Design a protein with these regions (language model features):
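N-terminal binding-site loop/beta-alpha segment at the start of enzyme catalytic domains
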Residues: 1-23, 79, 85
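Beta/alpha (TIM)-barrel catalytic core signal, keyed to glycine-rich beta->alpha loops juxtaposed to Asp/Glu
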Residues: 7, 61-247
Length: 247
């Protein structure tokens, strides 16, 4: 959950408090400064009605100057570290669907980083350019014993331009166009899970959640031949990530 997700924190709060011991709670902030990060952390704790957040993450890192800012003396990570010392957060991470090279730099520069959230799916795995090389992020994180959370596993491409399909008419709430057929969802989950990620993150639209959970429950591995076959089939498809390529 994140403050930028509308009133999601307020809606989640009541059920979260009922089942707090059963839930690993991840939250994010787009603030890059010390003061801003503290302010948003306090807000999220209050809105969620909890005393601690299991994983608190820098949300949507995209540019080099942002990395410089969060790692500075007055940056967000200084606030994260204080909050961790005070028991308000248990772990600290960052998320990005931007340049893999930036995530690699973050892994090298932030010694106490505990998780990274980044895209991984057969479309980006099939691209030859470094700007799609999220597999390098997975490898570096594994070397450093940093947790890996895979997002955009179910991304099927970008939506048509808004003059062709207005946002209000999109059949799913995701900012990217998701795959929606049960067999496609199962195939995408199997691929992501087979990469050795710590966790595969669900898609954002509630209409897809049940199918993804069913795919997870039925997961029985995916061999190398099946992975390569899927990559070859979709490698020329459009990818909505890295995000900066679409600005």
């Amino acid at each position: 959950v994140a403050p930028t997700y509308g009133d999601a924190e307020l809606k989640l709060g009541p059920k979260l408090r009922q089942h707090r011991e059963e839930i690993f709670l991840g939250c994010k902030t787009q603030e890059r400064t010390y003061e801003g990060a503290w302010r948003k952390l306090d807000q999220s704790l209050n809105r969620l009605g909890v005393d601690t957040i299991d994983l608190y993450q820098v949300h949507g890192l995209e540019y080099d100057e942002e990395l410089d800012e969060i790692t500075g003396d007055d940056g967000a990570l200084a606030a994260f570290r204080e909050a961790k010392e005070q028991g308000l957060i248990d772990h600290m991470g960052l998320t990005s669907h931007g340049d893999p090279g930036l995530i690699l730099d973050a892994l090298d520069r932030i010694d106490d980083l505990e998780s990274v959230m980044f895209p991984l799916n057969p479309v980006v795995a099939g691209k030859d350019d470094d700007e799609y090389d999220y597999e390098a992020v997975l490898a570096r994180a594994d070397e450093k014993n940093v947790g890996t959370l895979g997002i955009k596993a179910f991304a099927g491409g970008s939506w048509p331009p808004t003059d062709e399909l207005p946002e209000a008419d999109r059949p799913f709430a995701n900012w990217y166009r998701p795959v929606t057929a049960p067999d496609e969802i199962r195939e995408r989950f199997d691929f992501a899970a087979a990469q050795g990620l710590t966790s595969v993150i669900n898609a954002g639209d509630p209409k897809l959640v049940t199918m993804i959970l069913e795919a997870a429950a039925d997961y029985d591995g995916m061999d190398e031949v099946a992975q390569r076959s899927l990559i070859e089939r979709v490698r020329h498809d459009d990818s909505p990530v890295p995000e900066q390529l679409h600005h």
